[in-house]
């Protein structure tokens, strides 16, 4: 018996990083996973795992989300993972940077939740998990202005949905990681003028002396997706190795 036996889980940004680790962890616990991403080539790799189907999806496109929803008869868990990290202060952030970040990090969740929530309400049960960050309303982080703003909005969205539908069988929580060692992070480090120093800077702020792994975050994802967390809603779940202390 798996902890997620029989549950249908839809998640975004599943091709790599936390999304990929979560998709694999969900499937290993018995869930039927519909893994989505814009990266078709990387996404296809997940089809090697029993219990995982894949769909190419751009979460900023409302029509694509609606078409996916029509394909699915039932959904137990919606996990919104897709996100973009902009580096810089408010003075480094152009209007285009602002709009792109907000579209990927917040508007996509608005689209996903608004599309799939009616199906959950009809079932009288549903579980929504949103990916936020410690870099949000939890902690001010240097050079994360628009990113932190967007992730603070995710916390607000999470609490609002949880409050509005708590008496209709709906739960909504968000996950707030600190620094996680993912392909996305490694790409950002390599894009810096001095990648070696950038890596040292990331490690220096880790009170545990290391970054989290995507698999460690996936353990929390499994808990929140399972009935073990049935009494948990409207919360931001911090997993940051003590960075926010």
From Swiss-Prot:
Top-level EC class as recorded in UniProt: oxidoreductase
Keywords in alphabetical order: Cytoplasm, Lipid metabolism, NAD, Oxidoreductase
Pathway recorded for this protein: Amino-acid metabolism; Siderophore biosynthesis
Annotated SUPFAM superfamilies: NAD(P)-binding Rossmann-fold domains
Catalytic activity: cis-4-hydroxy-L-proline + NAD(+) = 4-oxo-L-proline + NADH + H(+); (R)-3-hydroxybutanoate + NAD(+) = acetoacetate + NADH + H(+)
Quaternary state and interactors: Homotetramer.
Active site per database record: 147 (proton acceptor)
Gene Ontology CC terms: cytoplasm
Subcellular location: Cytoplasm
BP terms from Gene Ontology: heme metabolic process; lipid metabolic process; siderophore biosynthetic process
Residues annotated as binding NAD(+): 16-18, 37, 58, 151, 180-184
EC number(s) per entry: 1.1.1.-, 1.1.1.30, 1.1.1.104
Record-given protein name: Dehydrogenase/reductase SDR family member 6
Coiled coil regions, renumbered to chain: none
Gene name of the encoded protein: bdh2
General function of this protein: NAD(H)-dependent dehydrogenase/reductase with a preference for cyclic substrates. Catalyzes stereoselective conversion of 4-oxo-L-proline to cis-4-hydroxy-L-proline, likely a detoxification mechanism for ketoprolines. Mediates the formation of 2,5-dihydroxybenzoate (2,5-DHBA), a siderophore that chelates free cytoplasmic iron, thereby regulating iron transport and homeostasis while protecting cells against free radical-induced oxidative stress.
Residues annotated for substrate binding in this entry: 144, 188, 205
GO terms for MF: 3-hydroxybutyrate dehydrogenase activity; 4-oxoproline reductase activity; oxidoreductase activity, acting on the CH-CH group of donors, NAD or NADP as acceptor
Alphabetical list of InterPro entries matching this protein: NAD(P)-bd_dom_sf, Sc_DH/Rdtase_CS, SDR_fam, SDR_superfamily_enzyme
The family this protein is said to belong to: Belongs to the short-chain dehydrogenases/reductases (SDR) family.
Lineage top rank: taxon: Eukaryota
PANTHER family attached to this UniProt entry: DEHYDROGENASE_REDUCTASE SDR FAMILY MEMBER 6, DIHYDROANTICAPSIN 7-DEHYDROGENASE
């Amino acid at each position: 018996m798996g902890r997620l036996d029989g549950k249908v889980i839809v998640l975004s940004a599943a091709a790599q990083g936390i999304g990929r680790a979560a998709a694999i962890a969900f499937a290993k616990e018995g869930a039927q996973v519909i893994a989505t991403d814009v990266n078709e080539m990387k996404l296809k790799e997940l089809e090697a795992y029993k219990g995982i189907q894949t769909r190419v999806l751009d979460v900023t496109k409302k029509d694509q989300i609606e078409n996916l929803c029509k394909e699915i008869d039932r959904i137990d868990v919606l996990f919104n993972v897709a996100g973009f990290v902009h580096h810089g202060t408010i003075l480094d952030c152009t209007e285009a940077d602002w709009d792109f970040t907000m579209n990927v990090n917040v508007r996509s969740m608005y689209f996903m939740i608004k599309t799939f929530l009616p199906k959950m309400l009809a079932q009288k049960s549903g579980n929504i998990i949103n990916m936020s960050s410690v870099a949000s309303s939890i902690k001010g982080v240097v050079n994360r202005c628009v990113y932190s703003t967007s992730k603070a909005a995710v916390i607000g969205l999470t609490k609002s949905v949880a409050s509005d539908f708590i008496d209709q069988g709906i739960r909504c929580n968000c996950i707030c990681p600190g620094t996680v060692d993912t392909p996305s992070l490694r790409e950002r480090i390599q894009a810096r003028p001095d990648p070696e120093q950038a890596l040292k800077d990331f490690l220096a702020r880790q009170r545990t002396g290391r970054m989290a792994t995507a698999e460690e975050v996936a353990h929390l994802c499994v808990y929140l997706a399972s009935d073990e967390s049935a009494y948990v809603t409207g919360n931001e779940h911090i997993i940051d190795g003590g960075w926010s202390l």
